[in-house]
A protein has these predicted regions:
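Catalytic core of DAGKc-family lipid kinases
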Residues: 12, 36-40, 45, 49-51, ...
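A residue-level signal for conserved active-site and pocket-lining positions in enzyme catalytic cores
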Residues: 16, 77, 185, 238, ...
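Glycine-rich beta-strand-to-loop/alpha-helix junction loops that act as flexible
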Residues: 17, 74-76, 97-101
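ATP/NTP phosphate-donor binding region
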Residues: 1-74, 81, 85, 121, ...
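ATP/nucleoside-binding phosphotransfer catalytic cores, i.e., glycine-rich phosphate-binding loops
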Residues: 3-6, 24, 221-232, 251-383
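Short amphipathic alpha-helical segments
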Residues: 25-27, 83-87, 107-109, 251-252
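Short, glycine/serine-rich, charged loops/turns that create anion-binding
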Residues: 18-19, 101, 181, 244-245, ...
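Glycine-rich phosphate/pyrophosphate-binding beta-alpha loops
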Residues: 178, 182, 237-255, 322-323
Length: 383
């Protein structure tokens, strides 16, 4: 695509002005200025659709979608989720300036993390050259009895007369839907009065890990081969993953690919003992965590998650680090529904991450690619 293709195009910038004690607003302003400078050179216009809050910014990005051709989200995974919910399924490309604490989605795409000028340069280059990739998303919607919560606090929503509201969940996510331990850690950290974000998360993780609960889930999933599996899962951890990373780089779902038309269901088979915890931690950043037998794994096209009769009450659901709602919920993969601006090198790297390479990793970890089970007999057959 020639450089003249972006002449008279409009690039919208959206950020979260309340993030990081107001520093998010400063970074957003910097991104706008950098894009305006590039726009004068390449002939595109820049508008800022940032609102006064996360929800206000999302509403602006949605309601003003006919005013722009590209949307640039500035912030962490939550802001990328905002961008996905603003332009998902529209064909309008999303640019990512990753400046959060986790940045797991950007990390999975090998985009710059906490390097604002480099990220903007990459976005401008992608706009000028027309380079992008189309990635999958998950769509979470409420089943009967499920409902959305306040996206900032996780609290139940109330009306003007303090009457509880029960709006349905209807939300795209780009990275992970967290239904267990990872959600409870985030929730505890968000409600902590400790001053430092890293300290809040560390303390919350220690508390939750040392008081691990056995949450009760009932799942009904359409697997990759089209068969339907229905069962209870009593587990501290249950995650429906579109991307590989969580928690600032932990590869909890190393077999995930952004454009395979599938989601990966990952859970703990049981409350792990000390040795199993050490084994999992030692493989957390190497892409080999699912080689640990304490984990369960399956590829799914869609999944219904409800409350099992046994087990503890699951925590509030979180997607990409933001509050979503309460069970029950249905999740369906949205095949290549989000267009993302990327440099040519990233597009080539993602294209090189083939299904064959993923199957090699699955076999390396002694798992059956169809059933997801760790099987000694299968391991011997695959050698």
């Amino acid at each position: 695509m020639s450089e003249t293709s972006c002449v008279n195009a409009t690039v919208a910038v959206v950020g979260n002005p309340t993030s990081n004690k107001g520093k998010g607003a400063e970074v957003g302003k910097q991104v706008v200025e950098l894009l305006q400078e590039a726009g004068r050179k390449h002939g595109f216009n820049v508008i800022d659709v940032t609102g006064e809050s996360f929800d206000d910014s999302l509403a602006n990005a949605r309601n003003r979608r006919n005013e722009y051709d590209y949307l640039v989200a500035v912030g962490g995974d939550g802001m990328i989720a905002l961008g996905a919910n603003a332009v998902g399924c529209s064909g309008k490309p999303l640019g990512i300036v990753a400046t959060g604490s986790g940045n797991d989605f950007a990390r999975g795409l090998e985009l710059p993390v906490n390097r604002v000028e480099t990220a903007v340069d990459g976005i401008v280059g992608a706009i000028v050259r027309g380079t992008h990739i189309d990635v999958d998303m998950g769509l979470a919607t409420s089943l009967q009895g499920g409902y959305a919560v306040d996206s900032s606090t996780g609290d139940d929503l109330v009306g003007d007369s303090d009457v509880p509201l029960r709006p349905a969940v209807n939300r795209f996510y780009a990275g992970m839907l967290s239904c267990g331990l990872d959600a409870s850690i985030n929730d505890r950290a968000n409600h902590s009065r400790l001053p430092n974000g890293s300290v809040r998360y560390f303390v919350a993780a220690i508390v939750e890990l040392t008081h691990m609960k056995r949450y009760g889930y009932h799942i009904k999933a359409t697997l990759a081969d089209g068969t339907v599996e229905e069962r209870d899962i009593i587990s501290p951890l249950l995650t429906v993953a579109n991307s590989r990373h969580i928690g600032g780089g932990i590869e909890i779902s190393p077999y995930s690919r952004f454009s395979d038309g599938l989601l990966d269901l990952v859970w703990l088979d049981h409350v792990p003992n000390v040795a199993e915890c050490v084994d999992a931690v030692s493989h957390a950043y190497s892409g080999k965590i699912l080689g640990c037998k304490v984990f369960g794994w399956k590829r799914v096209r869609d999944i219904e998650i409800t409350r099992a009769q046994e087990g503890d009450e699951p925590p509030v659901l979180m997607a990409d680090g933001e509050y979503v709602g309460r069970l029950p919920v249905k999740v369906v993969v949205q095949d290549r529904a989000l267009r993302v601006l990327v440099p040519p090198a990233v597009a080539e790297s993602q294209a090189a991450n083939t299904e064959e390479k993923v199957l090699e990793a699955i076999k390396r970890d002694h798992r059956d690619p169809v059933t997801g089970k760790t099987d000694t007999c299968y391991a011997k057959r695959s050698r």
